[in-house]
A protein has these predicted regions:
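Catalytic domains of carbohydrate-active enzymes, especially glycoside hydrolases
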Residues: 77-102
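Conserved aromatic anchor
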Residues: 437-443
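N-terminal export signals
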Residues: 2-14, 20-40
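Substrate-binding cleft of secreted/luminal carbohydrate-active enzymes
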Residues: 316-325, 347-415
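Aromatic- and acidic-residue-enriched segments that line the glycan-binding/catalytic groove
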Residues: 106-118, 152-177, 214-240, 288-295
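Beta-strand-rich modules
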Residues: 481-495
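Active-site-adjacent "subsite" loops/lids of carbohydrate-active enzymes
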Residues: 61-74, 151-200
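Active-site neighborhood of glycoside hydrolase catalytic domains
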Residues: 204, 223-279, 283-287, 299-300, ...
Length: 507
C-alpha cells in the first residue's frame, strides 16, 4: 500500500488515484493553490441538517411485528421492510418501542420478554430484536432511539405479567386505573426500577437516543374531564410521601425527579445518547391564551414539560402537536412558537406530527405546511419533526410519500448536531478508491461518515456510513455511487459535529 499522502484540507480539493490513501491535515495554509477539481466543483458547504424521525410502536403490534409469536425470520424480514421504507423516505431516525408495558423487546435480567413480540410475556422470541434493529438501522444510515413507556404496567389483558414482571414482584406498587394497570410514579422504588431499566439499555446497546413518551401519571379515562372526575388511586402513596403538599404539585415533583435522575443516569453511561421526551402538546389550557382544551397535562398527568426543557433535562423535546394549523383552538402554528419560547436551555425542539390523522378532513398538504413552519421557527440547521407513526407513512396516507419526496424530504439530511454533548471538532477520514470500491479509515470519535456527491449542479448527501461498533477504527468499504466522479467525505462525531471535508475525484 502506498505511503499516506498528506493533502490540503477541505478549503481545497485534490484529484486522487485509485490506489492512494488520502487524509486531510490542518498543516496547510489557507492561501494554498486549489486543484482543477476545486475549481470545477466548489467546496461543499455544511451538511444539510434536519431531524426526520418516525415512531415505531410494538404495543398492540401497531407497527411491528404484524402479530405476536411470528418466527425470528418473519419478524426480521418485517423489520427490514420497515427500515427500508424509512430510508427510502429519507428519514434519518427511528424511535423504536422497547418497553411497551413493564416488559422488554430485548433480553433483560430486569424485566420479562414482551408478549407483543413472542406471544406470551416472558417467552423468548429466539433472538435479540433490539440488537438486530440497531445494527440494521445503522446500516441504512438511520439513528435508532430506544423508546420506553415509563409507568405502564399492563397494556393488554391478553398478555398477563410473568413471574419476574415488576407488577408480580411488587403488586403494592401498581394501581388499576382506566381499565389498565399502572406503576405508581409516587413510589420511589418504581422510579428507581425504571431508571435501572433505561440505564441497562444505554449500557448494553449502541442506541443513538433514549426516548420517553407521554404516559407519566395516566390520562383520565375517556368520558371524564380530568383527575377530579376519576382520581388516580394513589391515596396510600400520598399519605406516605406527600408531607402535606398539594397533591398535584407532589405528583409533578415525582415526575420531575424521575426525568432529571433518568437524564443524569443516561449521561453517566452514554454521554452522546440524545435523551428525548414526547409530552402531550398542550402544556396547559389557556397557554397561550387562545388555546382551549379539557386536559391539563400539568395538573392531570404531572407533566411539567416546560420545566424539563428549560432545565436541560432532555436533549430534544417532541411535544405531540397533533392538531392542524387551523382552527385556532389547538393551532399547531400557535403552539409551536410558544414551545420555542420556553427553550431557554437551547435544546432541540422537534414536534410530533400526526400522519395517522391524514384523511378526508386533513390532506397530506397539512404535514408539508407544518414542516415548513418547523423550518421557519427553528435555528438554522436545527429543525426537525417526529412522525406518528411509521405505519401511516408506509401506508402512504393521502399520498404523503410523494408529498414528502417531491417536497421537504426530496434529498437526504443528517441529524442536527448537539454541541452540548461534545464540542470537539473531529478529524476528517482517510480514504482510497479502488475498482469502484471506496475504502475509508475513520478518524477517532467517528459516529458516521457522510458521503456527498457532486452532480454538476450541487452537492448531495448520498449516504451516512457507520463505523464498526466493535472495531471503530476498522476500514469501512462502500461502493462508489453510480456515475459519481467527485466525492466529499466528512466525519460526524458522536455529538453530530462535522469535520472538514476530504475531497475525492474518481479518476
Amino acid at each position: 500500500m502506498a505511503t499516506l499522502k498528506p493533502v490540503m484540507p477541505s478549503a481545497a480539493s485534490i484529484s486522487i488515484s485509485r490506489r492512494r490513501w488520502l487524509r486531510t491535515t490542518a498543516a496547510t495554509a489557507a492561501g494554498a493553490l486549489l486543484s482543477p477539481l476545486a475549481q470545477a466543483a466548489p467546496r461543499p458547504g455544511s451538511l444539510p441538517r434536519e431531524f426526520r424521525a418516525a415512531w415505531m410502536a410494538t404495543v398492540f403490534n401497531l407497527d411491528w411485528p404484524a402479530s405476536p409469536g411470528l418466527s425470528p425470520a418473519e419478524q426480521q424480514a418485517q423489520l427490514i421492510a420497515q427500515l427500508d421504507a424509512a430510508a427510502r423516505l429519507h428519514l434519518n431516525a427511528l424511535i423504536f418501542q422497547v418497553r411497551p408495558s413493564g416488559d422488554a423487546v430485548y433480553p433483560s435480567s430486569l424485566e420479562p420478554w414482551s408478549g407483543f413480540i413472542s406471544g406470551a410475556t416472558g417467552r423468548s422470541p429466539g433472538y435479540d430484536p433490539l440488537k438486530f434493529a440497531v445494527t440494521e438501522a445503522h446500516r441504512r444510515g438511520l439513528e435508532l432511539h430506544a423508546w420506553f413507556n415509563p409507568f405502564r404496567a399492563r397494556a393488554s389483558k391478553s398478555h398477563g405479567p410473568a413471574g419476574n414482571h415488576l407488577a408480580t414482584r411488587h403488586p403494592e406498587w401498581t394501581r388499576s386505573y382506566g381499565g389498565g394497570l399502572w406503576f405508581d410514579p409516587g413510589e420511589p422504588g418504581v422510579r428507581q426500577h425504571t431508571i435501572r431499566v433505561i440505564a441497562d439499555v444505554a449500557q448494553r446497546y449502541a442506541v443513538d437516543g433514549i426516548h420517553i413518551d407521554d404516559y407519566f401519571y395516566p390520562y383520565p379515562p375517556k368520558g371524564t374531564s380530568g383527575m377530579g372526575a376519576s382520581p388516580f388511586p394513589d391515596d396510600a402513596t400520598y399519605a406516605r410521601y406527600g408531607r402535606g403538599r398539594d397533591r398535584a404539585a407532589w405528583r409533578r415533583s415525582n415526575v420531575n425527579a424521575f426525568v432529571s435522575e433518568m437524564y443524569a443516569a443516561v449521561k453517566k453511561i452514554r454521554p452522546s445518547a440524545k435523551v428525548g421526551i414526547s409530552p402531550f402538546g398542550i402544556w396547559r389550557p389557556g397557554v397561550p391564551t387562545s388555546i382551549k382544551g379539557k386536559l391539563d397535562s400539568y395538573e392531570h398527568l404531572g407533566a411539567d414539560a416546560r420545566t424539563w426543557l428549560a432545565s436541560g433535562w432532555c436533549d430534544y423535546l417532541s411535544p405531540q402537536l397533533y392538531w392542524s394549523i387551523n382552527p385556532p383552538d389547538q393551532s399547531f402554528a400557535t403552539l409551536l412558537p410558544w414551545w420555542h419560547q420556553q427553550n431557554r436551555s437551547g435544546r432541540h425542539l422537534w414536534p410530533g406530527m400526526a400522519i395517522d390523522r391524514i384523511g378526508a378532513q386533513r390532506p397530506a398538504r397539512e404535514i408539508i405546511n407544518q414542516l415548513a413552519l418547523t423550518r421557519e421557527s427553528a435555528p438554522r440547521g436545527r429543525a426537525g419533526a417526529c412522525h406518528w407513526a411509521l405505519k401511516g407513512l408506509r401506508q402512504n396516507r393521502g399520498g404523503i410519500q410523494e408529498a414528502l419526496l417531491t417536497g421537504p424530504y426530496a434529498s437526504r439530511a443528517a441529524v442536527p448536531a448537539s454541541p452540548w454533548l461534545g464540542a470537539a471538532i473531529p478529524e476528517p477520514p482517510r480514504a482510497v478508491c479502488e475498482g469502484g470500491i471506496l475504502r475509508i479509515i475513520p478518524a477517532a470519535d467517528t459516529r458516521w461518515i457522510a458521503v456527498q456527491t457532486w452532480d454538476e449542479l450541487e452537492w448531495q448527501l448520498a449516504a451516512l456510513l457507520p463505523p464498526d461498533m466493535d472495531s471503530p477504527m476498522a476500514t469501512i468499504e462502500s461502493r462508489v455511487p453510480d456515475n459519481a466522479r467527485r466525492l466529499a467525505l466528512r466525519t460526524l462525531s458522536a455529538s453530530g459535529l462535522e469535520s472538514e471535508a476530504l475531497m475525492v475525484e474518481i479518476a
